[in-house]
Regions:
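Carbohydrate-binding surfaces of carbohydrate-active enzymes
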Residues: 100-278
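Substrate-binding/catalytic cleft of secreted carbohydrate-active enzymes
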Residues: 2-145, 149, 153
Length: 278
């Protein structure tokens, strides 16, 4: 079963880059040598939450402890580093951990626990999903794969295209600072859609929609993988625009992320209210 049910079944799967022997250190050590007998690529065997074959995979270390692990000679790759239930959602703290991980040469990433909420569909309770209170509600998505709040945080932080601007104002000239975090693709394989919009007022009808004032599309700048530069969407902010939407689309037509930049009108309002403005 070990040979046919896992190794021979998955030996050519493109997503298999390690073999995981057990969980939380595991006790199947007698099987460690069996993997390479049937794997021509002889991919590394790891023991999650253990230090084995050059990988330190310890789970749920604090931010400070994680930095200490990165000073050790082994590759640091926590096979669980944020828990969807006990850490208050996968998005809580992910930015801080991820920025530390991606900048450190000894860390190659980590894993979140877990993809989907887990539970037993009770036929004796009219299909109610029983996860013993909240013990199985630790997924990025729900039991029916509905998107939860952390889904969007993860999508934003792990997007291979990152806009570094945090705000814009009425003097915005259309130029964004951008990082291309793809491993191989040039940013010019992506395209960017933008919209300047005006939001309904609280006094407007309840069915009032966001008004698109102006929109356009640009190709990504010529920017090789793992580099930074400028993306020019070639527009200035309209006087009555409340926000600018910017959407990155990958070469296959999938949305990477959509950023919303409220137009900072503080200076404009100050000028209007100040008696010195005249």
């Amino acid at each position: 079963l070990f040979r046919s049910g896992m190794i021979e079944r998955d030996v050519n799967h493109p997503s298999i880059i390690w073999w995981s022997n057990g969980n939380e250190k595991g006790w199947n050590t007698e099987l460690d040598g069996e993997f390479h007998k049937y794997d021509p690529q002889k991919r590394p065997v790891i023991h999650p939450q253990g230090n084995f074959s050059g990988f330190e995979t310890m789970h749920y270390r604090s931010y400070g402890e994680s930095q200490n692990y990165m000073r050790l000679p082994e590759i640091f790759m926590p096979t669980e580093f944020l828990h969807g239930l006990y850490d208050g959602g996968h998005g809580a703290g992910l930015y801080d951990y991820w920025e530390m991980m991606r900048k450190h040469p000894r860390c190659i990433g980590g894993f979140l626990w877990v993809l989907a909420d887990e539970g037993v569909k009770r036929v004796d309770m009219d299909g109610f999903i029983d996860n013993q209170g909240n013990f199985g509600a630790d997924g990025i998505v729900g039991p029916h794969h509905e998107k939860e709040g952390s889904y969007y945080t993860i999508k934003q932080l792990w997007s291979p295209v990152q806009i570094m601007n945090t705000s814009i104002d009425k003097q915005f000239d259309g130029k964004f600072s951008v990082e291309n975090r793809y491993d191989y693709l040039n940013l010019n394989t992506c395209r960017f859609l933008w919209k300047q919009v005006k939001f309904p007022l609280a006094t407007d009808a309840s069915n009032a929609a966001v008004q698109v004032l102006k929109e356009g599309e640009v190709q990504g700048s010529d920017m090789v993988a793992h580099s930074a530069g400028i993306l020019d969407i070639k527009t200035n902010i309209l006087p009555n625009a409340d926000a600018l939407f910017l959407t990155a689309i990958d070469p296959y037509g999938h949305e990477l992320w959509r950023w919303t930049f409220p137009v900072n009108k503080l200076n404009q309002q100050t000028e209007q209210l100040s008696p010195l403005s005249s």
